[in-house]
């Protein structure tokens, strides 16, 4: 054994045999590196100094002269970026609206525009012909390429209650949710005469509430319905007065079974924004908040329904983008206003779903993700992220500056409250900031920041570390406090510090450079660059698990005498540790063989290599085997006995 390495080692067989001490050579003590430098500050995400939607949601009304303009209606303001593309004939919520004068605000008389782009008086003026032409052309192309299966999905998402439709985003929990909510739909097939007859869902949308006798799930249904307060898209539609795509171009092919759903009153049937999208995203995001174990999947389902409005030929991409933006604002405002109801609904939802799935808190997450992609179309988180990004922009190129810093709306951190219960409100705001969409896309650069929020990406944790990022997880609280995964590719110059007793798994191609310190809990590497490009320092109460498919690389590695390192070796390079600089390690080293890998006696198993190796493990445990260490100045392996 090299004089560069001193081992006081216990090589244990996990079948119950008594371990035998194996002692290495003594060597002079090595100066132990210090933790990565403390940046001395934490990141922040202040709200813009503008009237906040959550403080003004009650102004999202039509038929009230007090709330009929851009300045006085919060819903209209959320999507005011549309005014750079299209100027309505009148800047009032007045399409088909009459309202008396009130409190000094002038009476509202109905707009005289026809709602038809080719019939005077038209409802507005095109200011950006390139973007608006692309907006409608997208629908032409989509509807002409539409498959029969897509047409069927678009029909159901149009005619069914949105609260019912989006519940299939629950995956393996869908049946339990619908049973508990007592949800029903009367539209289980597309009738043969649907091309001439308008069918209306006579089901109950979100289900049966507490007042109707649903003791097990009524609070959940009540809360979902409560989230629709002040959520109407009609004020926005009647302000912007922008036509549906099939009125702009006859080349748009509405799903034949939805032709009877076309409104014969174009003057009051604006396309911008999509009401179906706004309601679906609001319902889906609320359900995601109540069951964060399916958070990303539920938000993805809401966005899918929005895209199906384009597939149907009923809406354009900008209509759907605007609907998503209003949904985020309304959900934030109502979660804030009805927070106590939300917490009660959260508790009831879990109790009911645990009972109906015969699970416990410790097994519920696994059950919620037990179905393969063939049975759960939202099972692939990578695909969810890609689809969300596509559905946020629908192929539009930026038309404004690309590098404006993100702004997080006031109160928006509540959207992630149950998804990241171990993060502070400020930290959740920073998560939203660091995962936001780049600036410059049509209508999405609103003053508050609703348009750029990428909620699907935010559900995967930070996108960037700036300054100190201290995460404290209490495993005793269960759920995400006990174990969580961050999948984003994290950049920045900040430092990550893990505290507490929970397990945090990092799986992105991370580039953060400020280093990583594990003061408590378990930090797991699920990718080769999980720990960024800085130093990794493990304190006496800390534990690191290397469980990536390829060797994990760090700049330097230090572990104190009571620390623990686990290597999950798969025989294909996974589970190994590569340190570009010095490795100074104490504590316990646990080696496991995973994914069916079963080495044989006599095999030499590489574990780690470093620029320089100074390992002082108090014991090495090789699960299922007896072994002895084989080391050099830069490498450590074990030979199975």
Protein language model regions, located:
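Sec/Tat signal peptide C-region and signal peptidase I cleavage site
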Residues: 20-24
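Alpha-helical transmembrane segments that form the membrane-embedded catalytic/substrate-binding core
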Residues: 276-280, 311-339
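Extracellular/surface-exposed low-complexity segments
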Residues: 338-402, 437-490, 590-641
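Extracellular beta-strand/loop-rich repeat segments of large surface/secreted proteins
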Residues: 496, 525-603
